Amino acid sequence: MTKDIAERLMSCYSGAIFDALREKGITNCVLPPEIAPLDPSKKMAGEAFTVSGHLDLNMDPHETLLRWTDFLSKAPSGSVVVCQPNDHTIAHMGELSAETLHFKGVNGYVVDGGTRDSAFILNLGFPVFARYKTPRDVVGAWVPDSFGEDIKIGEVNISNGDYVFGDLDGVLIIPSSEAQSTVDRVEEVMSTENLVRKAILQGVDPREAYLSYGLF
């Protein structure tokens, strides 16, 4: 069976992916470095399911939870949820929500905002990438208001269906139209890097290794 793009990306790492995108002239693809993995050992890859929302401190708590759980119901299996909350004051992910997404087969969650219940999420093993941690939650405070629409995090535009990859070094967005050729090139780059590594460990001068293999 042929591996899909997300599965192949899980064998890659962000540095090689960026190098392949840079060769294509795509450099505005890395989310702000403040967005970091809750668990540094976790990777994630999948097609983006985009979400945006807004802070509203006058919302009825019941209504906020209805709209939040509606969002959880919409998240597709195999996707990576990418959320632009337009807010940097509360947590936009927590234990029960992570449990729900994990059970549904969602591959990870990226938010230009916060998370909470960190110990529980770490124990669950669900990949969450966020700017910060706080115990404040969405109840009576925040609601999602669009799904599957274009969003922007930092200077990076993200469309539903673009590919998302995250590891210890950060999160990259791969345009859907470039995903197949990018992962093909990443696998070539990693294979060549193995040859460079072997040469260096055999005592080859780094400049000579670069000239021989064309990368470093």
Residue map of PLM features:
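Intrinsically disordered, low-complexity regions enriched in acidic/Ser/Thr/Pro/Gln residues
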Residues: 1-63, 67, 71, 80, ...
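Structural motif
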Residues: 18, 28-29, 47-50, 78-82, ...
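Extracellular/luminal Protease-associated
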Residues: 71-98, 102-112
